[in-house]
Amino acid sequence: MRPYKAIDIPDFPLIQSQLLELLDQTITDFSYTNTKATTYELVKDKCPRLIEFLDANDLVWDVGRFFVTPPRDGLYIHVDGNSERSRIFSLNLPLLNCEQSEMIWWDNVEVVEYRSHESYGNNIAKMDSENKIQIASLALTTPHLVRVDIPHSVENNQDNLRAIFSMRFKPEPYHLWY
């Protein structure tokens, strides 16, 4: 089974442009791998069609974050969560230059340490990647529900900045997966 699933979001081009405007108001330094949480109220005000989609699909907002990856940069192999509570799913929305970057899932890796990463917005487990085996990859060109409990990384191997909007929900959205 693939660790991702395409999700059809009505009026996504409109939502994408509204989120890009919000991104410019939220993140000011694009020179390093950066993330910034935004509030439900702000997204509700600026992106009402996205909130309509969430409501129509019984998705209860937990956190929404912008993730920016500079050119020729990435994020190391990790899983989202910690030893007490792991995240399972993230709804990732492509915003800018996602066509030539990849989210990659891995096998044969083990947790090295759990870290609280304020800059990444949650606890993550850094993985030992010496014997890693790639099991899947995705160029995020449309909205996808992705597994974040499986070791994964991001590679932006292009000369352009990559930006996405990533949402987490309580409870986890199993009903969108199955």
Stretches found by the model and what they are:
Residues 55-73:
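A short glycine-rich, His/Asp/Glu-containing loop-to-beta-strand
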Residues 44-57:
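N-terminal leader segment of winged-helix/HTH proteins
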Residues 8, 68, 94, 145-147, ...:
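Short, well-ordered beta-strand micro-motif
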Residues 69-143:
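Catalytic core of non-heme Fe(II) oxygenases with the double-stranded beta-helix
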Residues 116-178:
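Catalytic core of Fe(II)/2-oxoglutarate
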